[in-house]
A protein has these predicted regions:
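NTP/phosphate- and nucleic-acid-binding module
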Residues: 1-382
Length: 382
């Protein structure tokens, strides 16, 4: 991802955190390492972390040598899921909430996976892929686990649709895994077909009991007056695929009001205001360049201090027409372009141009911060 893509994914992750840790619920953020501790048996599945020279030295003794067993046994295993690392924090989480259920743990991080055989250039080699994933592990009593699964399904589907231009492209389907455990998949309808962006599943207590063998008493949480081993509800999202979904969702071809040519359309990336990497572009129009840039710099500092992301177009040295700037900023999904001109020096008025409506309005420079803050906040609360 480049700068804009990285900012888009960061904004999506920030919105995920806001939804995963609602004020009324006991959900805590954790951060497990990328790889597990050494000691996994040689035959255990998983991607190993090895220095090439160490592996070469071990292989010189033959493929089944004790040296190779030692090397594989001391290698860390790259995580393919956030779940084991999150579940390892369950007992500590339980103490924080005085053993009261329900409660939850959440993490965002990179996970690794073997690429499908169809994507391998050599059938004898296995390539490794990575993805940025989100996980909410929700611990509830077995009695209410089904209700909580339905609750999180509604919440998550509503969340994905909230930021979409075409909400109906996000859908859900139910399934049962090989062990009969119930779950749901949330999909996005891409041009080439439907792909999963998030999976919800009631894991029961199996994973917890495997994580803490012989220590089931540590797992007991309070459900009213009863002590129970909770069921784990896993809400596992693919943020990289989510970014791709919103890029496809927001790309629109609109009529170009700046030209009379037939079949002339402008490309607009109409990302939701909360997801747009940049909220504002600052540019200068006619007037004394030095003074106008000083005004832009002051406004840039004020907006960024208030966490409004700004593109400093006024620093550009290659001249461009307003039409070219509008096209560029629409494709960058910038919500507003602010034009500072000699009129700003005279009376403090700037021109504000909207990405979504292409309408231009005049506004006093002192009102910009509050206007932009309210605009993004109101979009978030819809």
């Amino acid at each position: 991802l480049g700068p804009l893509g990285a900012a888009l994914r960061a904004n999506l992750a920030a919105q995920w955190w806001d939804s995963a840790i609602p004020p009324r619920e006991q959900v805590f953020a954790v951060d497990a390492p990328l790889h597990g501790p050494p000691g996994a048996p040689r035959e255990a599945r998983g991607l190993r972390l090895l220095h090439p020279e160490t592996l070469r030295d071990a292989l010189r003794g033959g493929g089944h040598s004790p040296a190779l067993d030692r090397v594989l046994g001391t290698a860390g295993v790259l995580r393919e899921s956030l779940l084991p690392g999150v579940l390892a924090q369950y007992v500590s989480c339980l103490e924080l909430v005085n053993k009261r259920l329900p409660c939850g743990l959440a993490q965002i991080g990179v996970c690794f996976h073997s690429l499908p055989e169809s994507e391998q250039p050599d059938e004898n080699l296995t390539r490794i892929g990575e993805r940025t994933t989100s996980l909410l592990a929700w611990f509830s009593s077995p009695r209410t686990a089904g209700q909580w699964l339905d609750y999180w399904l509604r919440q998550r589907l509503q969340w994905w649709r909230k930021f979409a231009v075409g909400p109906s492209n996000f859908s859900s389907s139910d399934f049962h895994d090989e062990e009969g455990r119930r779950g749901f998949k949330l999909h996005y309808k891409f041009p080439w077909g439907t792909e999963t962006v998030e999976t919800l599943k009631n894991l029961g207590d199996t994973e917890l009991l495997q994580m803490y063998p012989g220590e089931s008493s540590k797992l007991l949480g309070r459900d009213g007056r009863r002590n129970v081993i909770p069921h784990v509800l896993s809400v596992n999202g693919n943020l990289d695929r989510g970014v791709l979904a919103y890029l496809f969702d927001s790309l629109q071809l609109a009529e170009n009001p700046l030209t009379t040519k037939k079949n002339s359309q402008r490309k607009v990336l109409k990302l939701h205001p909360c997801l747009a990497p940049l909220k504002v572009a600052l540019d200068v129009g006619k007037g004394p360049t030095t003074e106008l840039r000083q005004v832009c710099q002051g406004l840039f500092n004020e907006l960024t201090e208030n966490r409004i992301s700004v593109w400093p177009g006024y620093l550009e040295t290659v001249p461009a027409s307003l039409e070219q700037l509008y096209t560029k900023y629409d494709e960058m999904s910038i919500l507003f372009m602010i034009l500072i001109t000699d009129a700003t020096l005279e009376n403090g008025v700037v021109q504000l141009r909207s990405r979504d409506t292409t309408m231009k309005e005049m506004m006093h420079i002192s009102r910009l911060k509050d206007f932009l803050t309210k605009y993004v906040t109101s979009a978030k609360n819809v």
